[in-house]
């Protein structure tokens, strides 16, 4: 009888030890952090007070956006000490002392994106805000975007494990 119980115990142990649920079915291995920079671009006129830039992800990264990716776009607003860029997350509003305002914002689909500057005045009178603009587009998994301070470009890059050498530079 002891031999039969031992046999059942060994067979049972082998049967249950081979069953596991670590197949990682819920892991999205296609989503990856990615960053690219659109340098020195002039936004195109839509109306006197609205200018934009349209592009496709396929053009920028040779692929469309995936379901679980979040798009973060930063605008270069300054350079400190000739080598330290200042990146501001958009959407962003720039207010002037006279009450005028410029809003930078973007929208996107899985295929394309549009970065827009819209003002309460004719933007041709403020070329510094529409010409020679530089933007950083960072694509990160949505769960990472939910857990990091998106306003801080450096924190986003650190959390995404991206460094400056991995940012693809694109000249329009």
Question: Could you tell me what each predicted segment is?
Answer:
Residues 1-4:
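Positively charged n-region of N-terminal signal peptides that target proteins for export
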Residues 15-18:
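C-terminal motif of bacterial Sec signal peptides marking the signal peptidase cleavage site
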Residues 28-172:
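First exposed extracellular module after export/assembly in secreted or surface-exposed proteins
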Residues 20-23:
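Bacterial signal peptide processing site
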Residues 6-13:
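Sec-dependent N-terminal signal peptides
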């Amino acid at each position: 009888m002891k031999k039969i119980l031992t046999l059942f115990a060994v067979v049972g142990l082998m049967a249950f030890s081979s069953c596991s649920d670590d197949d990682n079915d819920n892991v999205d291995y296609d989503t990856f952090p990615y960053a690219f920079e659109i340098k020195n671009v002039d936004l195109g006129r839509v109306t006197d007070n609205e200018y934009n830039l349209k592009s496709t992800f396929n053009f920028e990264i040779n692929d469309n956006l995936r379901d679980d990716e979040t798009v973060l776009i930063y605008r270069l607003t300054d350079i400190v000490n000739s080598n330290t860029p200042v990146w501001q997350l958009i959407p962003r509003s720039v207010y002037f002392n006279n009450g005028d305002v410029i809003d930078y914002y973007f929208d996107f689909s899985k295929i394309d994106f549009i970065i827009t500057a819209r003002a309460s005045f004719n933007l041709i009178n403020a070329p510094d805000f529409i010409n020679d603009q530089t933007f950083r587009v960072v694509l990160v998994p949505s769960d990472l975007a939910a857990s990091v301070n998106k306003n801080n470009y450096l924190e986003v890059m650190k959390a995404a494990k991206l460094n400056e050498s991995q940012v693809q530079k694109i000249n329009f």
